[in-house]
Amino acid sequence: MSDDENIIKKIIHEGTKAEKLELFGFEFQTPRKKIRSKFKLFARACYPRFFDEKSADFHDDVIMDLIMSYISDNKLVAGFRGCAKTSLAKLFIVFVLLNDKDEHRKYLKVLTKELKNAKQIVTDSYNLILEVSNLYGDQFAKEGDIKREETMGGYTMRNGTKISAGTIGQTQRGHVQDAYRPDWILFDDTEDVKSISSMVITQSIIESCAEAIKGLSLDGSFFVSCNYISDQGVVQWFMNKASVDVRIIPLLTDDQ
């Protein structure tokens, strides 16, 4: 183990709050590979239960795609169920909400075919932030004695950064238009076997995705986490977009 690794290990286990916050914190100008290293340190130190098994080699690529998407690029990662792409995305959301010193993104949005799935991702991120309140303090905005948005479809951080859940499935009755344009979108579970069997449903989802992308802020970007189940569906529509960088994760074999 190198001297630097020993120092990092000592900070994680014995360091002050200030030392840990500096270890995990990043800025827009921080080299991207260094941000990835900081994310991995943060995730493993704060949420070790997500790493009971050895991480697959492709996880580094997925993390880098998340970082580049958050910074400026449109990325798509298509992988098999169980490859941890959604878990990594949730941990990444928590990482940037807590550690981005420049607050590069001010409004994050999670969009799924079924609204309940987007709400679950948002709620999970909220609960993960609560778990590290001993290090980061209370990070949620309060307005007098008004109850914070806890298990609902969104919440606001103390610095003003927002995250909310939405759907690209059926139109929600009473849907309220966003007052502000999101500047980063996570598309997750945009289609399934049922939706792919209907061109009407597929086209409706595509139109909703297109509308969401059009509604991004001028410097906004998005990340698509998906399973590639058809070359005629929503995922293929994303893949065909010239502005989207695509990564397809192959199935692991027994020796991988």
Question: How does the language model describe each region?
Answer:
Residues 1-83, 87-256:
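Short, flexible loop motifs at catalytic/binding sites
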